[in-house]
Amino acid sequence: MPLSKKIRVMVVDDSAFMRRILRDILESDPDIEVCCEARDGIEAIEKVKTEKPDVITLDIEMPRMNGLDALKFIMSKYPTPVIMVSALTQEGAEATIKALEYGAIDFIPKPSSSISINMRELRDEIIAKVKEAAKVPRRFLQLRRRRVLSEQLKKAKKVGEPARRAVAIAASTGGPQSLLKVFEKLPGELDAAILLVQHMPPGFTRSFAARLDRISKLNVKEAEDGEVVNKDWAYVAPGDYHMEVTLRNGKPTIKLYKGPKIHGVRPAADPMMKSVAEVFGRRTVGVVMTGMGRDGAEGIVAIKRKGGITIAQDKETSIIYGMPKAAAETGMVDYIVPLDKIADTIVMALRKIPR
């Protein structure tokens, strides 16, 4: 059923061709209208004052003023849900991670003939993300400071020791900025491994893992097929691969594979969480954080049935209360906590689990 009031979107891109593609995609949905366009950051700032759009799609690389600088100004003066439009390149990935830290809600891949994603799938993703962004509570719309890296966090790569306990974390929309807060607070001596699924395309997960590694006392890396899961390390599922944990020669080992998408995504958290529950049993903590959809809910059930401990982010601090809500509705969540308590709750849960 169409909304009573259309979602008004401003499209910002220096390419007239790209603005046309995005306009056509957005206006193919009856609930969305493109209220205005801008060719660069300066024009975007001028138009956001007068047009007051509900959502902005913002290119990163533009002349005069780039997307990051425009984002910082908009979030500080005219807080509006912003979705970054990012090239699927390493530079694009790194800039996008910065944008999410500064306050962008989400990002979409820039449509092009070279990207390996069909147009219908891309259309559905863009429209879904714009609709979710339009619902984001105003309290989340603000310029955030990027974390300054402490010299004390320069850490030696720990010698590998196979983990006997594990924390399985699922996150999607709003996840990157929220996970940074969690990882910043976790101790370096966790005596457990972390397995993390954050819905992101290839390349972006590597940049995100590197960013987490820089702000965390734990060692964080993008997972590789066949590597042993070690304690005090965190493994981020790479974009476009499902990640599971299996036992190989008695050691927990990463398995990556390109199976069918689950809940429309790859990587998906459910197969990862179920596999962690199988390998680690009651020595598992499951965590579901902000994101749209219901990925992670089945994983929470699997972990609880094996005797593990389960945690979900609360509604008030979730940028999108979809995945945590689905997890909570299973009736299998032990602790529903705000974002700033997730790290402490993980540590507390691990204290209850045998080493």
Swiss-Prot record:
Task: Identify the Gene3D superfamilies for this entry.
Answer: 3.40.50.2300, Methylesterase CheB, C-terminal domain
EC annotation from Swiss-Prot or TrEMBL: 3.1.1.61, 3.5.1.44
| Post-translational events | Phosphorylated by CheA. Phosphorylation of the N-terminal regulatory domain activates the methylesterase activity.
- Alphabetically list the UniProt keywords: Chemotaxis, Cytoplasm, Hydrolase, Phosphoprotein
Q: Which residues carry this modification: 4-aspartylphosphate?
A: 59
- Function summary: Involved in chemotaxis. Part of a chemotaxis signal transduction system that modulates chemotaxis in response to various stimuli. Catalyzes the demethylation of specific methylglutamate residues introduced into the chemoreceptors (methyl-accepting chemotaxis proteins or MCP) by CheR. Also mediates the irreversible deamidation of specific glutamine residues to glutamic acid.
Family under the similarity heading: Belongs to the CheB family.
- What is the name of this protein? Protein-glutamate methylesterase/protein-glutamine glutaminase
Q: Which organism is it from?
A: Thermococcus kodakarensis (strain ATCC BAA-918 / JCM 12380 / KOD1)
